[in-house]
Amino acid sequence: GTIASGKLSIKQKVKVLPSGFEARINKIFESDKEINQAYKMQAITFTLDDHIDLSRGDFIVDTNNPCDLSDQFRVDLIWMDVNHFLPGRTYIIKMECRTLKAKIFIKYKYDIENFKKNMSKILKLNDIASCDMIFETKIVYENYEVNKTLGSFIVIDPDSNATCGAGRINFALRRSSNLIFQNLD
């Protein structure tokens, strides 16, 4: 794979996300040449000191500097399709080497003439909006300002397979998992 950020070194302790398994880097190869370290945007192959099942779309992170996982995000989205955006519809999201499903809900649309925030239920061609995006599962991410590779995505129409939008992750929505319903009667 390609290193999205940081570096990998021989004997470095890493974590596989989203599974959480840990191992150490055993060997690193660039083309057919064995190397000791690899850096951002370098395409490499590596081996681990343990047998861990890795799948396309898994991430290898340093155990001392792990990425966050979330399934809900505030994003900026530009709509690039003549067919209007349908809020709450499940769209296909392509991020780096991952293909996922998510629902997108508009918070507000930007008026590109004066940058005011306007309420809207639809997006038309070339509209830009702030949206909440909810994935079917937790994903590894970084905000676009930190890492453009892990913080950007394209939106694909599930019926036509056409690219209909593109966007960037601004931040994760921290929803509590320990909320308890309170009867107010």
Where in the sequence are the language-model features?
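C-terminal effector/interaction modules appended to NTPase cores
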Residues: 1-185
